[in-house]
Design a protein with these regions (language model features):
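Glycine-centered loop/turn positions within well-structured domains
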Residues: 156
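Expand to "…catalyze enediolate/carbanion chemistry for C-C bond making/breaking, isomerization
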Residues: 159-160, 168, 172-176
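Conserved alpha/beta-domain cores
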Residues: 1-153, 161, 173
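Conserved, well-ordered active-site substructure
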Residues: 165
Length: 176
């Protein structure tokens, strides 16, 4: 993929990324897209150019505390599940409060939202809801223009609803 000109890659496990980052070309921008564990976040902040799955203020605070020379781009993970937050992500009703708190932290640049389509709702409805929330979010947070949504099974629909970042690892690498 690198030979084809791609320079941005995602990883959802810290240990796997750490093993790759030092061995692969330095011009690669790594995105962390997996579930965050507090004990791994300091490591993730050292190699990830962007962290997509921040869903709690304490995680943003840990990133902020790393005193990184350049603000670390992050996305807030939004829950589209019912009940909210059952599979990770912040409840949409709490999104703006969380973003307001994160925005005040030094060393963080709020770039957008990330979401995983719920298992129980029609995809069209979920992506339409996500787009509407993202549109409202961008109206308040002008730099939060990116939308990380869509995986191997639904990325085409996610693109049609405004996704700018996709997570299609299993289509490329196969299932784990």
């Amino acid at each position: 993929m690198y030979q084809l000109g791609l320079r941005e890659f995602g990883e959802n496990r810290d240990q796997e990324a750490v093993a790759k980052v030092d061995k692969l070309p330095k011009d690669i921008k790594w995105h962390f897209q997996g579930g965050i564990q507090s004990n791994k976040l300091k490591s993730i902040a050292t190699w990830a150019s962007c962290i997509h799955s921040v869903d709690q203020l304490k995680y943003a605070q840990i990133i902020s505390d790393q005193n990184i020379a350049v603000a670390k781009p992050i996305f807030i993970q939004l829950s589209l599940d019912e009940p909210p937050e059952s599979r990770g992500g912040v409840d949409p009703a709490k999104l703006f409060d969380l973003a307001s708190s994160i925005e005040k932290l030094p060393g963080i640049s709020l770039q957008g939202l990330m979401a995983v389509a719920p298992l129980t709702s029609p995809l069209n409805d979920s992506f339409a809801r996500l787009r509407a929330i993202h549109d409202q979010f961008k109206a308040v947070y002008k730099n939060a223009i990116y939308l990380s949504a869509g995986m191997s099974g639904d990325y085409e629909m996610a693109i049609s609803y405004g996704a700018t970042h996709l997570r299609i690892g299993s289509s490329i690498l196969g299932n784990r």
